[in-house]
Amino acid sequence: MGLFSKVIGTHSEREVKRVIPIVDKIESLEPEMEKLSDEELRGKTAEFKKRLADKETLDDILPEAYAVVREASKRTIGLRHFRVQLIGGVILHQGRITEMRTGEGKTLVSTLPAYLNALEGKGVHIVTVNDYLAKRDAEWMGQIHEFLGLTVGVILNSMDNDERREAYNCDITYATNNELGFDYLRDNMVIYKEQLVQRDLHYAIVDEVDSVLIDEARTPLIISGSSGKSTKIYEACDNLVRQLKKGTEKELSKMDIIMKEDNNETGDYVANEKEKTVNLTEQGIKKVERFFHLENLADPENLEIQHCVNLSLRAHALMHLDKDYVVKDDQVLIVDEFTGRIMPGRRYSDGLHQAIEAKEHVKVKRESKTLATITFQNFFNKYDKKCGMTGTALTEEKEFREIYGMDVVEVPTNLPVKRIDHNDSVYKTKREKLNAIVEDIVASHEKGQPVLVGTITIDASEELSQLLKKRGIPHKVLNAKFHELEAEIIADAGQIGAVTIATNMAGRGTDIKLGEGVTELGGLKIIGTERHESRRIDNQLRGRAGRQGDPGESKFYISLEDDLMRLFGSQNLMQMFNSLGMPEGEQIQHKMLNKAIERAQKKIESNNYGIRKNLLEYDQINNEQREIIYAERRKVLDGDDMRDTIISMIDELVEKYVNMVIGDDQGPSEWNLKELNEILIPMIPVKPVTGEGCGSKQELIQNLKEEALRLYDTKEAEFPEPEQIREIERVVILKVTDSRWMDHIDDMDQLRQGIGLQAFGQRDPVVEYRLQGYDMFNDMTESIREETVKMLMHVRIEQKVEREQVAEVTGTNKDDSANAPIVRKSEKISRNAPCPCGSGKKYKYCCGR
């Protein structure tokens, strides 16, 4: 801590000091609340709502409301909010992030701002990381809110739309971040207002906020449909890649480059684990060309083969079974790198999942097409107010401030932390490290001290499990393969003699309580088998011990062969230690090592922040477009009269077509009326334009607008009830907009991938994406206008026009919560195919305009 901080205190200390007077006021009301009967305490809710209606603010009633919740908690679940929990509750209401250590009762803290903000009647969402915690917290903490007369709902993956709608209409709703995000996207795909499930996004309290807003923010939420592409190409590429040999690429120094030294690639391809890239060598390119009978792999028509070969190489060289994914029930299931959990229903995008399926010889499913997508950053920024809780957020404060506009306030613990955090033990090889870990576990087990071992991969947990079996140490393994038993395994992890191996304990959400007699043995011992890429995840593992003033200890074991050191450590330092003739099993102790580990972690954290920021920069462009489309859809769903919008579309089209054919400086004798009729009449069936009575271009435009309006009025008069044509307008706008928007999302996806591959010289790819995306969006809105007008101008009264979904939803990338599939009603016509109307023109120049 610097001298300046010592004198005036840290940011957190100053902010905590500011809320102390509010907390003192809450505590002073406790005797008064204790005197109230249950009925009188419950009556406070109606009193608070009346005070809000009388123009008091939430801040005005906060002290009394928090005192009411504290008393209700004592009477319902037998828990009284500690002073530090009241501090946390005030900070959450202010829309900030509160960092509270594991075991400090964050779940109970959330009841304070949830109750207060629910009094406005606009809904409060409490966001958790999995269904188990959402259900547990809704049942447990929900007792407090229901006692006080508020309604509590929970959103679970298995629920149908009616159940979801009912839960969202409650005062307080518990749900996972994935469910909230996907429900938002699905709400913007429905075709009737009655199908909407969510209300407006008012206030979110995010538990494990760093996990939700940072770890998971590297991948956007995606709802997908089938693209119709064949899967045979993936199997062919897999057969080819199995015949290719992995090579190495010599790293060239600056002098080598100056001397034009050849990098001497070997093998058919080179994989770089650090950068997560894989490339064919010259030799490899020739083999691919021979395999597919190609003259030149680089030709544009071979782009799909290039792409699929690259995916297959990535699947074999960079994606590892039991680390990145598992195979279960003839399916490839992704493993969350941060929590070690299997993520059912989630699939890698862009064909990578299919490449892995081919590699593992399971059924290759058809590639998907993106129908709707949003990042967590943009989704959570839609809330009027948001806040978060976690045990570890300070290391990412910059990101919370820059992207979400939230600062982090560290709340002191209720009792002093007694956990001892030992220095890391570093070994030369992985084998020596594992032997040392086993000896440490055996020693602790013999004296009865419970041990929790945190591993990064499933492989590592199973390897360690085998070593413990050989030594006869009874233990339990908790990883992605067995997470059904999760809560039961964790509940026993603090008992005397318990040994538990867990893949990435981060975000498990279940406290480990110490068994009888464990305190005297030193509490729970945490052993980390290697350092994670993120310091925050390491701190979360440490935080499993020493909860609520309990004793405990933590220690990390590292080898120079660990991925972190191998890929991101200083090469010179690694070579120096490797060259030392150290006896087998001896620990390496050097202050430079600790600095190297910290530097490596900071390097990765900075890199991951860059990935998330880059994702957000691209999605910000999509978000601007998404807001426009979703706002237009909502107008239609709300039953707005779309007549004025249609008339405006007709007027714009008339102007566009006249301007396309007739220049401002042309006189009537120069007008190309034949061309004007050819493009105008198929859209708006006016009489052939002769130019009679029009002395100027503006006069011609005005006459055509008036004739088009008369035509539309005549069309409207064909329907017995005006509401019939109004509903048809809504149906057509929805159908055309959805169809074009989904194609546009896919096109934007392709554009982004293309921009990543192109070299724009000194031009920023994000700027290029924005410029080209803007042009594509304008083209899309133009095609929506043309198709809508054309359909409405040609609609007949005997036609049965109903709202329908335009694409089949096949799944999402984060879970399997998509609703029942929606069937496409008609076969999609290729833009270049002959138009089915029989005009002889291509579809895109005729009915597909």
Question: What does each model-identified segment do?
Answer:
Residues 825-844, 848:
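Short Cys/His-rich zinc-binding micro-motifs
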Residues 1-581, 630-631, 647-648, 652:
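Conserved P-loop NTPase motor core
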Residues 453, 501, 741, 777, ...:
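Hydrophobic, well-ordered secondary-structure elements that form the walls
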Residues 254-257, 471, 824-828, 846:
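Intrinsically disordered, compositionally biased charged tails
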Residues 448-461, 638-639, 691-694, 836:
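Short, Lys/Glu-rich amphipathic helical modules
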Residues 325-333, 339-346, 548-549, 556, ...:
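Extended, charged helical/alpha-beta scaffold domains that provide interaction surfaces
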Residues 110, 437, 820-822, 830:
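Active-site-adjacent structural elements in folded domains
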